[in-house]
């Protein structure tokens, strides 16, 4: 859950001061083309216009499984993206299950995060829109169960106007269909843990980072696709898993086989 408030933690009253020091007050973005944030995974970046995730735009991230089971994976994917951007982050949520130390493990330090706690989706959306007016933010995250087309258009326009990236992490409710509604988001992602293939599960956990099944379901001007990637590291970076089956056996293993 979000850390308890203390004198050291940023408050909403300090948000304007933080954003002004990071990049100025709210206002329209310049006429230059929107920058992108490459993931560093060749096939993934090739599917995205400009070779990376468009900044100053709205993106949707869905948990790829039954309600609540993979919500943490979607949150960590969002955290890894924002970890590689400069400035504070406004995180709008209406449930208290966000685990701040987990965000730190993907590179997003809790000191960078300003939490906006609400009671329902209807309060998350205006909080996000307000945050997107502040150009010094690295990004604005909103945890929502549903988002209709009209609110998504408002968020997309606000992101375009300020150049601040907006991420909506969808949290499924009981009885809700997993199929997403139409929206104005630039991309729509679905992320879930990927079970290991061809090796023992316990060995897979010892050999490196967890694996995710990452799907780009919709991309304006790009190509949908799916990838198995290693989860974000301490700098928020994804990676392609090593192909263990193609590695030569270790010398000790070869020697043991020869003795037998």
Where do the model's predicted regions map?
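C-terminal functional extensions of proteins
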Residues: 188-260
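Short, structured patches in soluble enzyme cores that scaffold and shape functional sites
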Residues: 143-145, 168-171, 193, 218
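Short gly/pro/ser/thr-enriched loop/turn and capping motifs at secondary-structure boundaries
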Residues: 122, 173-178, 198
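Hydrophobic/aromatic beta-strand patches that form the interior of the parallel beta-sheet core
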Residues: 59, 90, 114-116, 167, ...
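A short secondary-structure junction signal
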Residues: 150-154, 178-182, 226-228
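Detector for small/aliphatic-rich hydrophobic stretches
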Residues: 1-91, 110, 217-222, 239-260
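Glycine-rich, charge-decorated loop segments at or immediately adjacent to ligand/cofactor-binding or catalytic sites
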Residues: 99-103, 174-192
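Conserved nucleotide-cofactor-binding alpha/beta core module
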Residues: 88-143, 149-153, 157-162, 171-172
